[in-house]
Amino acid sequence: MNMKDSNMTMTLRALEPEDLDFLYSIENETDMWVVGCTNVPYSYYTLQQYILNSTNDIYADKQMRLVILDENNKPIGLLDLFNFEPRHLRAEMGIAVKKTAQNQGYGQNAVKLAIKYAKNILHLHQICALVDLDNIPSMKLFLNSGFKHNATLKHWLYDGNTFHDVAVMQFFL
């Protein structure tokens, strides 16, 4: 599955075996661990097995990981639809874009493409994202993509020193 934005400046596609080095670099970016549920590095082997065992079927895996490619087909980020609940017609979204590719519209275009896919192919009713309130770029990304800040989860994330509040961002399709 490949999805291109209307300006043909970026593409979303399924994770491929040749993405292992890129996935390794993103998953082991310690700055991102605070917004996820990991606190240990992933090995190449573990990530290789993840790629090989993924069916790329959101109904089977309950998640879909997409690689964000720039106009030169270089991987610059990942967009995940996860905690997919077909019965309730919803999923969560997460996105990570390399620092060198941030603030160039790639993230917003990727989110818009994923929303279109969620609406037209998956027939979802809503997508939500949990965003650290201190993560201003991510808050702006989701707000500018049409998500609404509908709730706050107090002390939801812990970085080893401080608890952080999280915005529950929702987009109704």
Predicted segment positions?
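Acyl-donor (CoA/ACP) binding surface of acyl/acetyltransferases
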Residues: 1-20, 27-29, 70-173
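Short, hydrophobic secondary-structure boundary micro-motifs
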Residues: 34-36, 63, 166
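Short secondary-structure boundary/capping segments within folded domains
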Residues: 14, 25, 56-58
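A short helix-loop-beta-strand connector motif used in the catalytic cores of GNAT acetyltransferases and
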Residues: 54-67
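Secondary-structure boundary/capping residues
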Residues: 32, 60-63, 127
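Conserved GNAT-fold acetyl-CoA-binding loop/helix
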Residues: 31-53
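Solvent-exposed, charged/polar functional surfaces in cytosolic regulatory/catalytic domains
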Residues: 53-54, 117
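Short, solvent-exposed alpha-helical surface patches in well-structured domains
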Residues: 22-25, 49
